[in-house]
Every structure is written in C-alpha cells, then in structure tokens.
Amino acid sequence: MNAEINPLHAYFKLPNTVSLVAGSSEGETPLNAFDGALLNAGIGNVNLIRISSIMPPEAEIVPLPKLPMGALVPTAYGYIISDVPGETISAAISVAIPKDKSLCGLIMEYEGKCSKKEAEKTVREMAKIGFEMRGWELDRIESIAVEHTVEKLGCAFAAAALWYK
C-alpha cells in the first residue's frame, strides 16, 4: 500500500461531485411524505447514507447525474414534516467553497416553519459562519431551497448528494 495514502482511504474512493437537490410532497403518512419529497428531488430510488457536512477537496458541484437504482449515496440533508394544514415549511442546503482548493468545502442544511427565502438565507449564513470558525477564505456559496404549503401531511427536503465522475 502507498505510504502516502491514509489506510482508511485506501478502501474508500472519495466522492468528487456534489449535486444540490430539493423537493416536497404530500403523503398519507410521514414516511410517504418523506419518500415523495425524495422522489420529487430526484433521489427517491437510491439509498441515502446520511453524512455530516464536509465536501471533499476539489469536488465539483454538478447537476444531479443519473444514479443507479439502489446505489449507496453519501448525502447531507435536512427535512421537515408537518401535519398542520396551511402551514408553510421549507428546507435548504448550501455548500461553501474555499478559495484554497486543497481545503474541503462545507455543507450546511436547514429546515423550518418558514419561507423558502428565509430558509435559504439562514443556510447561507450558516455556511459563512462555518468558514469564519475555521479561519478559511470563502470563494462562493451555492444553495438551493424548497417551500411547501401543507394540505394534510407534507414534507420539504433539501440535500447535497455526493457522487463520482
């Protein structure tokens, strides 16, 4: 084994793309609403492996590729489910990209009883604060959000799905 490679990483290839997705749905049950939101976001037929909030260095933000059904997809996500008719719920995800491309990016997720605009503003501010905490220079922030007005039982979902070129 190459002495420069961390033994853990010798077994796992780091993802090199990130796709920001968001969706919402109504459902008969909370799980059906969540599943519908995943389908609406384009990632309903894969297995999400929930990760914390780090984007590998030099990973690119790309449109969601066609993922193989059943694939294990590392994903940072936020979601909210509500059964209050008329309530507005939103979910948002952001990725902060460093100026120094040898550093990792930072993914932040947010969900709340608020507008899409408020959720996206909050998640972008969280990414900025995360970079300030690390003392890193920010190049840019990419984000996406979704808003849903509950009819009976609804879900809003936003995610950063990591994958491979």
UniProtKB/Swiss-Prot annotation:
Which cofactors are named for this entry? pyruvate
* GO MF entries: arginine decarboxylase activity
- Temperature-related activity annotation: Thermostable.
Q: Which terms are listed as keywords in the entry?
A: Decarboxylase, Lyase, Pyruvate
Q: Is Transport tagged as a keyword?
A: no
Q: Does the keyword Lyase apply?
A: yes
Q: Which residues carry this modification: Pyruvic acid (Ser)?
A: S53
BP-aspect Gene Ontology terms = arginine catabolic process
Q: Which residues are listed under the site Cleavage (non-hydrolytic)?
A: S52, S53
Task: Quote the InterPro entries the UniProt record gives.
Answer: Pyr-dep_his/arg-deCO2ase (IPR016104), Pyr-dep_his/arg-deCO2ase_sand (IPR016105), Pyruvoyl-dep_arg_deCO2ase (IPR002724)
| Domain of life of the organism encoding this protein | Archaea
- Recite the UniProt cofactor note for this protein: Binds 1 pyruvoyl group covalently per subunit.
- Pfam families per record: PvlArgDC (PF01862)
Q: Which family does it belong to?
A: Belongs to the PdaD family.
Its subunit composition reads: Trimer of an alpha-beta dimer.
Q: What is this protein called?
A: Pyruvoyl-dependent arginine decarboxylase
Protein species of origin = Methanocaldococcus jannaschii (strain ATCC 43067 / DSM 2661 / JAL-1 / JCM 10045 / NBRC 100440) (Methanococcus jannaschii)
Gene that codes for this? pdaD
